[in-house]
Curated annotation (Swiss-Prot):
This is Cytokinin dehydrogenase 2. It comes from Oryza sativa subsp. japonica (Rice). Its EC number is 1.5.99.12. GO terms for cellular component: extracellular region. The lineage of its organism: Eukaryota, Viridiplantae, Streptophyta, Embryophyta, Tracheophyta. Belongs to the oxygen-dependent FAD-linked oxidoreductase family.
Length: 565
């Protein structure tokens, strides 16, 4: 009874807060007015806003592409926003939608880091997941580390950077990350969650012990590989189509204290990718060779006329005292040498970027890292004299992209349109892609953002989960490419989107069987043909029919926009 009284008091306080802070109410569209009236009869009514400021914010995302004014927005704005105080509020909303003859769309929104409106709910309700950690003082209770069990229970709304901090306080850490940690647990697990650790540990979805999920029919389910495994596999990498993740149990390992952050410079894609593949050759038939497994993190990037916007992702913080340049990983003298090498190489260089973790309870010593570096310098086929290294805090290395974000925000270059393109490529097509795209399409214009390229091991991915990677062509290795550009000037968005289309067209002509990561397609037919294919589409539809038959969830993805049953 006391608990319910506290809840009602919180609802009343929130209702007063919303009324005090919201601008004048925004009239809902005719299509949404009736269901908004119905929601007024629910116990969650005080948690719902339908004002223009709230719905506009919930309908925007990191991509900012509709804001850029290039063409018409692909999706209508949300009609309302739910600010839940507990998972049961989300379940009540979904049951209310499911009970209607014409169900309204519902989408969970974490940090809004999608780039094509994937988390939008056209004429429906966006769920502001961050509210779960704010209301009732519940943030701490929704992020709990079990030292004995070696896991962390994190609410779906929790940021990975906070998961890191909570775990590190106990000398522990998750092992698989994204490069940017200011994303929600539920958001990355709905896609895959990849970074330079994925070659060894798999994506984040391969590192989950248990989930709490609310399905499209409003059922609250705890699932794992042992309990409701089909739902567990469906939700992980499921693009928000089968349920809302409200809790994830993530395994932990002893945390290192430091990271040796290194860059090896190459003049050809062939040399760099060959070395990357040697470095990730762990747990593979044929052995790891002299360098396999020596690094804990392996990525790579393409150097194309870099400036602040292009290098923000991998700048150490604070800057080296010996450097006044915008790219503080290098001294001024080293940056001049790299620029000269780039000119000799025709304007394109490749950086193999890696890290070796050390210190802490179970990590190697600094002396052991020095020995590994000696082997790497000797064995890798980089340009001699072009190896750069810094020792940084482990947590600082993982959160390095945030430092770049702060620099871009200070320069007014963060909240701009981001027409990003992320691809998975078969190993057989990566060199043709490098030749046609890095040395062709992208070389004709300024880079305007980081360009990443690195390999992963197929056997670290679970094919029962919903995430889609390149077709199994018998090759253990496949690649991810991230072309992460910012449209800072007028006219950039249209030009960059046209260039993205040109890149995809090049892949089609060259026979490179790519898959989009963080995908965006304009129709269900394209999703079926280009993304899932004949083998995976039937399973995806079957799971949708089972867990969200009225296609309420995540309509912004454009996969299902009308009920299946």
């Amino acid at each position: 009874m006391k608990q319910e009284q506290v809840r009602m008091a919180v609802l009343l306080m929130l209702n007063c807060f919303v009324k005090a802070t919201a601008p004048p109410p925004w009239p809902p569209s005719a299509s949404s007015a009736s269901f908004l009236d119905d929601l007024g009869d629910l116990g969650i009514a005080p948690l719902i806003r339908a004002d223009e400021a709230g719905t506009a914010r919930a309908s925007a995302d990191f991509g900012n592409l509709s804001v850029a004014g290039v063409g018409a927005p692909r999706l209508a704005a949300a009609a309302a926003v739910l600010y839940p105080s507990r998972p049961a509020d989300i379940a009540a909303l979904l049951r209310a939608s499911c009970a209607r003859p014409a169900p309204f769309a519902v989408s969970a929104r974490g940090c809004g880091h999608s780039v094509h409106g994937q988390a939008s709910a056209p004429d429906g309700v966006v769920v502001d997941m961050a509210s779960l950690g704010r209301l009732q003082g519940g943030g701490a209770r929704r992020l709990a580390v079990s030292v004995e069990g070696r896991y962390v229970d994190a609410g779906g709304e929790q940021l990975w950077v906070d998961v890191l901090r909570a775990s590190m306080a106990h000398g522990l850490t998750p092992v698989s990350w994204t490069d940017y940690l200011h994303l929600t647990v539920g958001g990355t697990l709905s896609n895959a969650g990849i970074s330079g650790q994925a070659f060894r540990h798999g994506p984040q979805i391969s590192n989950v012990l248990e989930l709490d999920v609310i399905t499209g029919v409003g059922e609250m389910v705890t699932c794992s590989k042992e309990k409701a495994p089909d739902l567990f596999d469906a939700v992980l990498g499921g693009l928000g189509q089968f349920g809302v993740i409200t809790r994830a149990r993530i395994p932990l390992a002893p945390a290192p204290a430091r990271a040796r952050w290194v860059r090896f410079v190459y003049t050809t894609a062939a040399a760099m990718t060959a070395d990357q593949e040697r470095l990730i050759a762990v747990d593979r038939a044929g052995g790891a060779g002299a360098v396999g497994g020596l690094m804990d993190y392996v990525e790579g990037s393409v150097h194309l006329n870099q400036g602040l916007v292009e290098t923000w992702r991998t700048q150490p913080q604070p800057p080296s005292p010996s450097s006044s340049s915008s790219s503080s990983f290098f001294s001024d003298a080293d940056e001049a040498r790299v620029a000269a090498l780039a000119k000799e190489a025709g304007g394109v260089l490749y950086f193999l970027e890696g890290a070796i973790y050390f210190g802490g309870a179970a990590g190697p010593s600094a002396a052991d890292v020095d020995k590994r570096m000696d082997v790497l310098r000797r064995e890798l086929r980089h340009e001699r004299g072009f190896v750069f290294a810094q020792d940084v805090a482990y947590a600082g290395f993982l959160d390095r992209v945030h430092d770049g974000e702060l620099k871009l925000r200070a320069a007014g270059l963060w909240d701009v349109p981001h027409p990003w393109l992320n691809l998975f490529l078969p190993r057989s097509g990566v060199l043709a892609f490098a030749d046609g795209v890095f040395h062709g399409i992208l070389s004709r214009t300024p880079a305007m953002g980081p360009v990443l390229i690195y390999p992963m091991n197929r056997n670290k991915w679970d094919s029962n989960m919903s995430a889609v990677i390149t077709d199994d062509d018998g090759d253990e290795v496949f690649y991810t490419v991230g072309i992460l550009r910012s449209a800072a000037a007028a006219g950039d968005v249209g030009r960059l989107e046209e260039q993205n289309d040109e890149i995809l067209g090049f892949c089609e002509v060259a026979g490179i069987a790519y898959k989009q990561y963080l995908p965006y397609y304009g129709s269900q037919a394209e999703w079926q043909k280009r993304h899932f294919g004949a083998n995976l589409w039937p399973r995806f539809v079957q799971r949708k029919s089972k867990y969200d038959p009225k296609a309420i969830l995540s309509r912004g993805q454009g996969i299902f926009t009308s009920p299946l049953a």
